[in-house]
């Protein structure tokens, strides 16, 4: 799937934050979302390229797209597996 930020229902600006803050903020934000909603995460910490996909697998969310070729890194996360 190509990266389409318009799919997002919420946006989390995590630029300038360092590990583990971006993933902690993703977890807090996604907790208050409904299943099926999509979160756009913008971050510039290189560890997010590893941590966000791992978070999605561990917490049963879908990483539907990622753009990590340039800063800020951007991720589209769909809450839940459905």
From Swiss-Prot:
SUPFAM superfamilies in alphabetical order: SirA-like
GO molecular function: sulfur carrier activity
Entry's localization field: Cytoplasm
Keyword Cytoplasm attached: yes
Pfam families for the chain: TusA
Active site: 19
Disulfide bridge map: none
Protein keywords: Cytoplasm
GO BP annotations, alphabetical order: tRNA wobble position uridine thiolation
Superkingdom: Bacteria
GO cellular component: cytoplasm
Database matches in InterPro entries: Sulphur_carrier_TusA, TusA-like, TusA-like_sf
Family to which this protein belongs: Belongs to the sulfur carrier protein TusA family.
Protein's job: Sulfur carrier protein which probably makes part of a sulfur-relay system.
Annotated protein name in UniProt: Sulfur carrier protein TusA
Annotated source species: Vibrio campbellii (strain ATCC BAA-1116)
Gene field: tusA
């Amino acid at each position: 799937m190509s990266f389409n930020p318009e799919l997002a229902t919420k946006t989390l600006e995590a630029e300038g934050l360092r590990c583990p803050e971006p993933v902690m903020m993703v977890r807090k934000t996604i907790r208050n979302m409904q299943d099926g909603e999509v979160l756009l995460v913008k971050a510039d910490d290189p560890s997010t390229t590893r941590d966000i996909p791992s978070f999605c697998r561990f917490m049963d969310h879908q990483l539907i797209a990622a753009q990590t070729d340039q800063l800020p890194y951007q991720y589209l996360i769909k809450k839940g597996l459905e």
